[in-house]
Regions:
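Sec-dependent N-terminal signal peptides of Gram-positive bacterial secreted proteins and lipoproteins
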Residues: 2-29
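Preferential activation on post-signal-peptide N-terminal prodomains/segments
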Residues: 25-229
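Acidic, serine/threonine-rich low-complexity disordered tracts
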Residues: 329-354
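Short, solvent-exposed coil/turn segments at beta-strand boundaries
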Residues: 98-101, 109-112, 210, 239-247, ...
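Segments that shape or occlude catalytic/ligand-binding pockets
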Residues: 147, 151-237, 242-329
Length: 354
C-alpha cells in the first residue's frame, strides 16, 4: 500500500457533538433596556454593521474513498485493503460515520495520552496558561500546521483560521503537578507505571521531550466567514508528534463540507459592532467578569445541532457577532470570546459559564 501522508497509521471514526444553548436576557427589550446604559462604549474601530444573511446551505456527504484519496492519496482498492487489514467496518473507519454528515476522528496508540491532557482544560484552566506556539527542536510548528491544513483543504474542508500550541514537557509537567496538588490526579503520560487495574502507581510520572507534541485547532468557514457552533464542536483538532513524524490524535465534530448550493437566503436587521460589545460587556459583568478588555467584534455565522437537517443534508447559518476579549489570570493574559445573535443580541455561550 502507498505510504500515508505524514506517516499516519490511524483509524478514523465518525463523531458528532450535541449542541447546547444558553441565553442571558430578555431579547424583546431594546439594547439600552437590556444593558442599562446608552451606547457610550466605543469599539477600537468604527462601529460596523453585520451584513451576513441568514442562509440554509447544502452540505456534502463524503464517503470513505473520497477521504482516502484526498487525505492519504489512496486508491479505492488501497482503501478496501486497508480496511480489510484493520478488520474495520467501512461505515465507521476511514470515513464519515454512519449518517454521512462529514465528521471524522483520528487516533493512534498515543492518542489517549493527549486526550487525557486536553480533557483537563476548562473555564478555570486554559491552554494559554500552560502552552504557546513555539517550535519543538528543529521542527517548525508553522510548517507542520500548513501541511495538515492543506490536507484538510484537499478533502474539501474550508478553514477560517488555525490555533497552534506546543505541548512542551515543561508545560505538561507543570500541569501534572497542578492537577495532583489540586485533585490528586495523575496524567497518563507515556511510560507511566500502572497496576493490574490500569491505574498509575508510584511517583508522579514525568513528561519528556519524546512526549512533546503540537496541537492544532482548525476552525470551519463558509465563504471565508468563520462558522461557530454553540456546542463548541466546530473545529478539527489535530495532535502531531515531531519525534514520531506523524499525527497521533485528532477529531472533527460538526465540521461538514459546505457547498455553494443555497436553499434559502434572508436579509436581517443586525446590531452594529458597538451594540454587540455593549451586550457582551453586560453579560460578562453579570457573570462576575468585570475586568475584561474587549479586543474585537467580528461578523461570523453560528450554527447549533438543531439547525442541521441530516435528512435534507442542510445546515442553517445564523448571522452573529464574535466578541473577543482578554482577562488577566495568574499573571497571564488569557483570551476568550462570546457569540451573540446578530439580530436579537442573544448570547450563545460555548466558552464560559454565564
Amino acid at each position: 500500500m502507498k505510504k500515508q501522508a505524514f506517516g499516519i497509521g490511524i483509524q478514523l471514526v465518525g463523531i458528532i457533538g450535541i449542541g447546547s444553548l444558553l441565553s442571558g436576557c430578555d431579547f424583546r427589550m431594546s439594547v439600552k433596556d437590556r444593558t442599562g446604559e446608552t451606547q457610550e462604549y466605543t469599539a477600537e474601530s468604527a462601529a460596523a454593521p453585520n451584513t451576513l444573511p441568514l442562509e440554509v446551505v447544502k452540505y456534502q456527504q463524503l464517503n470513505t474513498y473520497q477521504i482516502g484519496k484526498a487525505l492519504y492519496d489512496m486508491s479505492e482498492e488501497q482503501v478496501d485493503d486497508y480496511l480489510q487489514d484493520q478488520g474495520k467496518d467501512p461505515s465507521f473507519y476511514l470515513g464519515v460515520g454512519t449518517n454521512g454528515e462529514g465528521f471524522y476522528s483520528i487516533n493512534s496508540e498515543l492518542g489517549d495520552y493527549y486526550t487525557t491532557v486536553l480533557s483537563t482544560f476548562s473555564d478555570d484552566r486554559t491552554l494559554d496558561s500552560y502552552f504557546s506556539a513555539v517550535d519543538i527542536g528543529d521542527t517548525s510548528i508553522d510548517a507542520i500546521g500548513a501541511q495538515i491544513e492543506q490536507c484538510l483543504k484537499d478533502a474539501g474542508f474550508l478553514i477560517a483560521f488555525c490555533e497552534k500550541y506546543a505541548l512542551c514537557a515543561e508545560g505538561l509537567n507543570q500541569l501534572q503537578k497542578d492537577l495532583y496538588d489540586e485533585e490528586e490526579f495523575k496524567l497518563y503520560a507515556p511510560g507511566a507505571e500502572v497496576d493490574e487495574n490500569g491505574m498509575q502507581t508510584g511517583e508522579l510520572n514525568s513528561w519528556g521531550e519524546a512526549d512533546e507534541a503540537y496541537l492544532f485547532y482548525y476552525y470551519m468557514a463558509y465563504h471565508n466567514t468563520y462558522v461557530a457552533s454553540v456546542s463548541g464542536r466546530n473545529r478539527i483538532q489535530i495532535v502531531y508528534s515531531p519525534s514520531k513524524h506523524q499525527v497521533v490524535y485528532g477529531n472533527g465534530n460538526l465540521c461538514p463540507i459546505l457547498t455553494q448550493e443555497v436553499v434559502s437566503s434572508k436579509e436581517i436587521t443586525s446590531l452594529d459592532e458597538n451594540e454587540a460589545i455593549a451586550l457582551a460587556k453586560k453579560a460578562l459583568s453579570e457573570a462576575g467578569i468585570k475586568d475584561a478588555r474587549f479586543v474585537s467584534a467580528k461578523p461570523v455565522y453560528v450554527n447549533n445541532f438543531g439547525d442541521i437537517s441530516f435528512e435534507d443534508q442542510t445546515m442553517t447559518l445564523v448571522p452573529a457577532w464574535r466578541v473577543e476579549y482578554t482577562v488577566e489570570k495568574n499573571g497571564k493574559t488569557i483570551r476568550n470570546w462570546l457569540h451573540l445573535n446578530a439580530e436579537t443580541g442573544e448570547v450563545y455561550d460555548n466558552t464560559i459559564k454565564l
